[in-house]
Regions:
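Asp-based, Mg2+/Mn2+-dependent phosphohydrolase catalytic module
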Residues: 2-6, 14-20, 24, 28-31, ...
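Conserved phosphate/oxyanion-binding catalytic-loop motifs
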Residues: 42
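Short amphipathic alpha-helical/adjacent loop interface patches that line ligand
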Residues: 71
Length: 253
């Protein structure tokens, strides 16, 4: 039995708006006893907040253990590969919780790492402080590099815009953990005791969700409900295994 790795923003919902067919698809997986994990690049929410958000949107039987975020993967990646624990963070509660769970401490001076996730309240001063740490030698690590974030039918700036700004200013390329980089997948597979042949990646974004699977030789399903549609496939040269307009197409009697 394969495990679905399911994207959230643009696949399950757009901000506070349900994606048509998403609740029905999750209910179908639950009814059939099919396995799934919500694999999201959105590092802003804790697992508890992510669960509550979906329950508020009308999804049923959602558990905290259903979620694996780029924040969790980033914290695990740094903890596994480095012994230092002092970090300067740009991010929200999801990234803060993930770093604390791996025993990182937050500092304003002499940071070992600058960890950058989406922060919708960050300002020029915060970005400049991050730049100072990077120029002083702190390792620059990004949860994800999404250009856009689906939000109630519109698109907001994604974390990739902030990461690119800091890369340009510092001349230092960030270590990127989230989709489409294999790092997040390798950490998840180890954490969940899965293999590549055990999974199906499902998402709306060719540059992240589908690219991760395409480059990793993993089965993918693209749903045309968010950032991209089938007209973008040839332009981006990223080819999903299957394309659907609506997740209801995946529901089988």
């Amino acid at each position: 039995m394969k495990t679905y790795l399911i994207d959230l923003d643009g696949t399950m919902y757009s901000g506070n708006t349900n994606i048509d067919g998403a609740r029905e698809f999750i209910a179908y997986l639950q009814e059939k006893g099919l396995l799934y994990i919500f694999l999201t690049n959105n590092a802003t929410r804790t697992k508890t907040q992510a669960k509550e958000h979906m329950l508020n949107l009308g999804f049923k039987n959602i558990k905290e253990d259903d979620f694996f975020t780029s924040a969790i993967a980033t914290a695990k990646y740094i903890a596994k590969n480095y012994s230092e624990r002092k970090c300067f963070m740009i991010g929200e509660s999801g990234l803060e919780e993930a770093l604390k769970e791996e025993n990182f401490i937050f500092v304003e001076d002499k940071a070992d790492f600058v960890v950058v996730g989406l922060d919708r309240k960050a300002n020029y001063t915060k970005y400049s402080e991050a730049l100072h740490h990077i120029l002083a030698g702190a390792k620059f690590i990004a949860t994800n590099s999404d250009r856009l974030l689906a939000n109630n039918g519109l698109f907001d700036l994604g974390n990739g815009a902030t990461v690119n700004m800091l890369e340009y200013a510092s001349g230092v390329e960030a270590i990127k953990v989230g989709k489409p980089y294999q790092t997040i997948l390798n950490i998840l597979l180890e954490d969940k005791n899965l293999k590549k042949e055990d999974i199906i990646l499902l998402g709306d974004n060719l540059e992240t969700d589908i690219k991760l699977g395409y480059e990793g030789n993993i089965e993918t399903i693209m749903v045309c409900s968010g950032v991209h549609d089938e007209n973008d496939i040839e332009r981006l040269k990223v080819y999903p295994t299957k394309v659907v307009k609506n997740l209801r197409e995946l529901i089988k009697d």
